[in-house]
């Protein structure tokens, strides 16, 4: 689930 990473990178 890269979705978690997607939202994480969204912060950046």
From Swiss-Prot:
Belongs to the tachykinin family. The modification Pyrrolidone carboxylic acid is found at residue 1. PROSITE patterns: TACHYKININ (PS00267). Expressed by the venom gland. The keyword ATP-binding does not apply. GO terms for cellular component: extracellular region. It comes from the Eukaryota. Disulfide bonds: none annotated. It is found in: Secreted. Keywords: Amidation, Pyrrolidone carboxylic acid, Secreted. This is Tachykinin-like peptide-IX. The modification Methionine amide is found at residue 12.
